[in-house]
Every structure is written in structure tokens, then in C-alpha cells.
């Protein structure tokens, strides 16, 4: 997790050149969810980070070698492939019944169990909210709660039906609670930022394709 007090370059150089060369390294920025104060990054951090992202573009275009790109951003091109290219290949046709991508099968891959024995879909949700509690050690899984978290598109049914980014949606149930209920308002707020990210990724994808990046490889 990259803190706001770093300049990115120090962390990048350490994990790319000083840390064990055969280890896989990924990085995320500090989450701003429920932050009391806004998360701010210095100009130096942004400059160093986006310079490495630009180098990842060059790597994707075979202009430089993989070892010349920071380990902290090597997954960037792969993320564009997964989030944009691979989904475009599906040629999904919207039918009478459809569902936005984004939600996982609650508790299947990353089940989180509290010390009290309560089940939650993963470690990213708010375990103080009953909206995410999907069972416990004594009673097992509450499948109706898991279904509710999977079918969060029901909260914004009309908007999802008309959304151009429905097949690129990454909005899961995490972060849309209000007390012990899932919030339609918070889901729409999350949707707005998700569409902005998708739009930027589409621009990157189209530019890289135009300059010869082979996402099929």
C-alpha cells in the first residue's frame, strides 16, 4: 500500500531493483473510503507514478524491456487487457434479462470470518454493517443475504439497463452501505466514478491499439 507521504520513486526502485527479483509485487494506493480528510498526493508522487505508467505503455508496444518498467505498475497493461480488451471480445448482446458485471459470488473466493464467527464476503467490506453479514459459524451461510449482495443491480435497475458501461462495470457491494442497508444513492455515486475510470481506460486502450499494441498476445 503506497502512502501519500512517499514520492513513489523510492518504493518503485526498492521493489524493482533491490527486492528479490523473482518475487511478484503489486501495489495499491491508500483507500479514501471513510477517510476523515481527503487523500492528497504530491506533485512529485504523481510525476514519478505516471512516468512509470508511460513506460508500461512503451513496454506494451515492445519499445522497452520488461525489466525497465517498475514492478509496481507492470500489471497496468494487463489490467487494460482484462478490463477492456477481454470484455470487448465477449460480444455480449443485451437481452431482456441482464446484469452488470462487478459483483462477486459473496464468500466464495475471499470469505472473511470475524473473531466472533460472523461471515462477510471479503476483507474489503464494513464488518460493522449488518448489510454485509452473510452468516456465521453456528448457522452457516445465509443464502438470501449472499443473493442480495450479488444482485445489487436491483438497487439501480433502470440506470443499469440504460448504462453504456454495464459490461465494464466494476462496482461491487463494498462501500455502498448506509447503516445496515445497501444504499441506492451511494451505488449511483460509485457508478459515476466507475464510468469515468472506464472512459479513461477505453482511451488508453484505443491509443495503444492504434500504435500497435497486441492485446491478443
What are these regions (language model features)?
Residues 116, 130, 155-217:
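Radical SAM enzyme core and accessory elements
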Residues 98-100:
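Active-site rim elements
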Residues 1-35:
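Radical SAM/AdoMet-radical enzyme domain recognition
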Residues 104-107:
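Short, small/polar residue-rich loop motifs at catalytic or cofactor-binding pockets
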Residues 46-95, 123-170:
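C-terminal accessory region of radical SAM enzymes
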Amino acid at each position: 500500500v503506497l502512502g501519500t507521504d512517499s514520492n513513489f520513486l523510492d518504493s518503485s526502485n526498492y521493489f524493482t531493483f533491490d527486492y528479490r527479483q523473482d518475487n511478484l509485487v503489486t501495489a495499491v494506493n491508500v483507500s479514501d473510503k471513510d477517510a476523515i480528510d481527503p487523500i492528497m498526493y504530491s506533485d512529485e508522487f504523481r510525476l514519478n507514478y505516471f512516468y512509470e505508467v508511460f513506460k508500461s505503455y512503451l513496454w506494451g508496444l515492445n519499445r522497452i524491456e520488461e525489466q525497465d518498467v517498475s514492478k509496481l505498475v507492470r500489471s497496468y497493461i494487463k489490467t487494460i487487457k482484462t478490463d477492456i480488451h477481454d470484455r470487448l471480445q465477449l460480444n455480449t448482446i443485451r437481452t431482456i434479462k441482464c446484469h452488470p458485471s462487478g459483483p462477486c459470488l459473496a464468500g466464495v473466493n475471499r470469505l472473511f470470518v470475524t473473531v466472533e464467527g460472523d461471515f462477510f464476503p471479503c476483507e474489503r467490506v464494513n464488518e460493522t454493517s449488518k448489510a454485509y453479514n452473510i452468516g456465521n459459524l453456528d448457522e452457516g451461510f445465509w443464502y438470501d443475504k449472499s443473493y442480495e449482495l450479488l444482485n445489487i443491480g436491483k438497487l439501480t435497475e433502470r440506470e443499469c439497463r440504460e448504462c453504456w458501461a454495464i459490461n465494464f462495470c466494476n462496482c461491487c457491494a463494498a462501500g455502498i452501505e448506509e447503516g445496515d442497508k445497501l444504499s441506492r444513492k451511494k451505488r449511483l455515486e460509485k457508478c459515476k466514478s466507475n464510468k469515468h475510470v472506464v472512459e479513461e481506460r477505453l482511451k488508453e486502450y484505443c491509443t495503444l491499439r492504434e500504435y500497435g499494441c497486441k492485446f491478443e498476445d
